[in-house]
């Protein structure tokens, strides 16, 4: 793995990895790879030592690749579902809980009657199950909704 901050992208690169998922899914731009975005975050000053990827990267990186970002402190379940139905993708900054003991970024890309579909760049297990709104909303600290 490419170095990222005090570790490598496989361990602490959830922010750039989530952005790569969103950018590719919405634009099909294959230049926006996790290692490329991690390098952009490092050189652009979006990596905060001891913390990880700055939240501002989630807006600035999207804009650089022609993706529209809207940032929210929270969304109601119906708002989350509406945005997903409209073809948007969502990144959440998660606090301590099911996804991490500290902070972590995940992608919400769909929902079914069983719950929300998540891509967790650090956990295949978390990505393989459905998540209910109450669990997600009790742990997120910030939400970005992305549109092409």
Feature map (PLM): residue ranges:
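Extracytoplasmic/secreted envelope proteins and their assembly/folding machinery
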Residues: 15-23, 34, 38, 55-62, ...
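Solvent-exposed loop/turn segments at secondary-structure junctions
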Residues: 21, 28, 43-48, 75-78, ...
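Alpha-helix boundary recognition
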Residues: 63, 84-85, 137
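Active-site-adjacent substructure of cysteine-protease-like catalytic cores
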Residues: 68-117
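Noncatalytic regulatory segments and standalone regulatory/sensor domains
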Residues: 111-148
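Mid-length scaffold segments of soluble, non-membrane domains
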Residues: 32-34, 39-73
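Active-site-adjacent structural segments surrounding the nucleophilic cysteine of cysteine proteases
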Residues: 1-48
């Amino acid at each position: 793995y490419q170095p990222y901050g005090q570790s490598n992208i496989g361990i602490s690169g959830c922010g750039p990895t989530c952005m790569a998922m969103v950018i590719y899914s919405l634009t099909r731009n294959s230049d926006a790879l996790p290692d490329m975005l991690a390098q952009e975050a490092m050189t652009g000053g979006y990596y905060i030592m001891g913390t990880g990827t700055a939240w501002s990267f989630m807006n600035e990186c999207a804009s650089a690749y022609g993706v529209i970002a809207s940032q929210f402190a929270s969304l109601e379940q119906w708002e989350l579902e509406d945005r997903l139905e409209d073809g948007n993708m969502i990144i959440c900054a998660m606090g301590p809980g099911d996804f991490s003991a500290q902070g972590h970024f995940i992608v919400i890309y769909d929902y079914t009657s069983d719950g929300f579909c998540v891509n967790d760049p650090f956990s295949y297990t978390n990505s393989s199950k459905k998540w209910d709104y109450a669990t997600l909303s009790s742990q997120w600290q910030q939400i970005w909704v992305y549109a092409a």
